[in-house]
UniProtKB/Swiss-Prot annotation:
This is Large ribosomal subunit protein bL25. The gene is rplY. Belongs to the bacterial ribosomal protein bL25 family. CTC subfamily. Transmembrane segments: none annotated. NCBIfam families: bL25_bact_ctc, PRK05618.3-1. Keywords: Ribonucleoprotein, Ribosomal protein, RNA-binding, rRNA-binding. It comes from the Bacteria.
Length: 199
């Protein structure tokens, strides 16, 4: 698997609310690139390309961070580590990039997507999810963007645990194999009576 996407950024000068606010007014988002060697490089990223790559890559998919300095461009494989948003606008205020070594494993929280309508729900049960993320470890380019769990065959009192996941090759879960992700429970008598009263 190859790295398919690149985000071009520039090194930035100035720290604190004043300089960061001026950057955001220019639709540039302040951020920090944490290199695999433990160095911190302050960068500024254009808002629209950043938003697009975040929507495509999330926190799980590696892309190249191309840093421009003094007319020279250098690309580093990274994951998006942490993102800060405006309190009421859907706009970035700060972003952290985590540099990875493609030959070394990383551990990432990967979204779990539940699909289908279970047999148990059709019989009156309730689908109860316990986790929306699962912690996985693999080399960066092997990390899945999400894990899809089909609940169609789940009957009442059935549970899908971490050990039931069909993970890609060379990817392992960091949770206990018996850790429950989703179950179908029967409605309690009180719930059934409440629904009957509403009818």
């Amino acid at each position: 698997m190859n790295i398919e996407k690149t985000l071009s950024v520039q090194k930035r000068e100035g720290y604190g609310k004043g300089p960061s606010g001026r950057l955001r007014a220019q639709k540039l988002i302040p951020g920090v690139f944490y290199t695999p060697k433990g160095e911190n490089i302050s960068v500024q990223a254009p808002a629209l390309p950043l938003q697009k790559i975040y929507e495509e890559m999330g926190h799980t998919t590696v892309f190249n961070l191309e840093i421009e300095e003094n007319g020279q461009k250098t690309a580093y494989p990274v994951l998006i580590w942490q993102v800060q948003f405006h309190p009421y606008k859907r706009a970035f205020t700060h972003i952290d990039f985590y540099g990875v070594d493609l030959d070394k494993e990383v551990t990432v929280d990967v979204p779990v997507e539940f699909v289908g309508t279970s047999r148990g729900v059709k019989l009156g049960g309730v689908l109860e999810t316990y986790r929306e993320m699962v912690r996985l470890t693999s080399k960066p380019l092997n990390m899945p963007q999400k894990i899809t769990v089909d609940v169609t065959d789940m009957g009442i009192n059935d549970t899908i645990s971490v050990g039931d996941l069909k993970l890609p090759e060379n990817v392992r879960a960091e949770f206990d194999q018996n850790y429950a992700l989703v179950t179908v429970i029967s409605k309690s008598k009180d719930d059934a009576e409440e629904e009957g009263d509403e009818d």
